[in-house]
Amino acid sequence: MKRYSRVLLVCFALIVVTSAATDKSGEKKASPSAPDKAYLQKIWDGWSTLDPANVAQFYASGPHTFFDIAPLKYSSWDEYQKTVTQVLAEFKSAKFTVNEDAELHPAGNYVWGTATVKEEMTHKNGKIDMGAFRWTMVFEKQGGKWLIVHEHVSVPTQ
């Protein structure tokens, strides 16, 4: 136990020293064209069309994990798009607004962010659903574009 504590202490000390020695100019930076709140809103404006093809340009292709309200997870954009298209077919209109609490955190070729999003969706039968949900996303710069490589959408169980 004593040896484990020493190893842990040494690791902690190395982290502190390394962090303190980091040049301020070497801090986390993203390119000037990193995602901002307007970019986030552009993504949700695309979702407001109820056609996932209109937001495909914002998502990385390949094996990436996306968590939506249901089902448990999607393992690729293709899988996500196929299922979401069926769900969205039940609606005639939608409006999504990224709230002022949106935060983006640059980390080199990645940017991670969080926001709450206000939603108003009208079913084909006229019923209106209104509420807010949580949105967490990770962007990666690929081919000069910021693409979502991981996303999590959830609703509180209130």
Q: How would you label these PLM feature ranges?
A:
Residues 43, 55-56, 63, 80, ...:
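Hydrophobic pocket/interface hotspot
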Residues 20-61:
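Short, low-complexity N-terminal intrinsically disordered segments enriched in polar/charged residues
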Residues 34, 52-107, 129-130:
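A solvent-exposed, acidic/Ser-Thr-rich amphipathic alpha-helical stretch
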Residues 108-119:
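A short hydrophobic beta-strand element
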Residues 132-157:
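Short beta-strand edge/turn micro-motifs at domain boundaries
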Residues 1-8:
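Bacterial N-terminal signal peptides that target proteins for export
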Residues 119-123, 139:
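Beta-strand elements of well-folded, non-transmembrane domains
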Residues 8-17:
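Bacterial N-terminal signal peptides
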